[in-house]
């Protein structure tokens, strides 16, 4: 898509980068297509590799090509396929993410091996949160937040499909985290910005760009950081990132954090072949991606550590909440506390159960742990979250294998027939759970979440395959 760049942007890039690098950037933005990349989900285990390497029945197959060098299990694709029609995407087998933003992996690997409680502040649609959840210590709790309601629902969907139980999804503004004083070891703030990294993908981003908007974004970004800063522990780490190139929203804000909030910049070693500019810019024309800036900072130790006050969890009155069958506990593996919230059974990681009341007191929680089951009349119906979770004990439910066409019908929430016993059945595609049906014999009730269904009546057959 040809792009006409604003003259002020061209001048700014020449001043900031120099004439030759600025020309390479602008030529790439104006005359080349966006790259396409995905990350595989290792938490789905052997199923991911096995499923993605199976011979494909649909006519369109896209193979993974070159690896993204700064992120494990990440690959470029030669072109952008119709991801919607790949059942493996809906099963959480992989996530479509812009390659430059995967550089977050280097910060996680190098500095976050002992992180216990992590906040992704502006997390929708979920690219960085799924990456964090993959590479953080297995027992760490990740709070993935998004203030905008519609985007928060998308975030909750993507985190559910990724399937890790030590996750909590919230819908809050940055200021809501201020009372959670010194709760988080790491805060990732991929802040709203002027969107220069979207120029190749979105013509509106080009049309909306102006120096006035850049400076407004800078002010907003500083306000966001000041609001959330009290929630970061002394000595904790802040990942500050944008999808812009300009210094006002990038380096100038990093200097402001160090000067006004109290922090130091940490070094992230880079391979010279990656083409990373400075600390740390990914520029189209130099790196294979859409554009990204990231800086990792450590909060100064001078502020006395003040653990957040414990909150006593309210116990339901006798008879107020229904009991649930003990057998539900055997549906998942791992150490969990089992809770009943509004006719829903939740398995929450025991290692962070003491923190849960505090988080629920201050935050609007959309999803947490593993939603096991919902009470439907007198029947406990297994939840879709359970089907997606890596904690699910396979073999708990009868399973039915779906063909490609049957899988798409299921994902459209159409009627499907299964050769399985009556009752709740886990339907799969290439070994990957897609969700549940309730088999009634002559027919099966489709239990796929209505709001997540494929709405398109057309089909462009596609599955991802491995050739690396």
Task: Write out the residue ranges for each language-model feature.
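Mobile active-site "lid"/loop adjacent to the S-adenosyl-L-methionine
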Residues: 150, 185-227, 243-250, 269
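Conserved class I S-adenosyl-L-methionine
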Residues: 114-122
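Polybasic, low-complexity RNA-engagement segments
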Residues: 1-44, 300-468
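Class I S-adenosyl-L-methionine
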Residues: 184, 237-240, 244-348, 352-354
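S-adenosyl-L-methionine
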Residues: 147-181
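Helix-to-beta-strand junctions that scaffold the AdoMet/dcAdoMet cofactor pocket
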Residues: 137, 232-234
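Conserved SAM-binding loop of SAM-dependent methyltransferases across substrates and taxa
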Residues: 125-138
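Class I SAM-dependent transferase core
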Residues: 71-110, 155, 445-449
